[in-house]
Curated annotation (Swiss-Prot):
GO cellular component: photosystem I; plasma membrane-derived thylakoid membrane
Membrane topology type: Single-pass membrane protein
Similarity remark: Belongs to the PsaJ family.
Main subcellular localisation: membrane
Name of the featured protein: Photosystem I reaction center subunit IX
């Protein structure tokens, strides 16, 4: 049961870190290469 509670505490933290990294990457790509849908 301790492994399950450890998963419940680490999974949201890992998801928040990963999603914030991906969102920041998308923002930086759109900052340097705007209108990427027109290529």
């Amino acid at each position: 049961m301790s492994d399950f509670t450890k998963f419940l505490t680490t999974a949201p933290v890992a998801f928040i870190l990963f999603s914030s990294f991906v969102f920041a990457l998308f923002i930086e790509i759109n900052r340097f290469f705007p209108d990427i849908l027109t290529f």
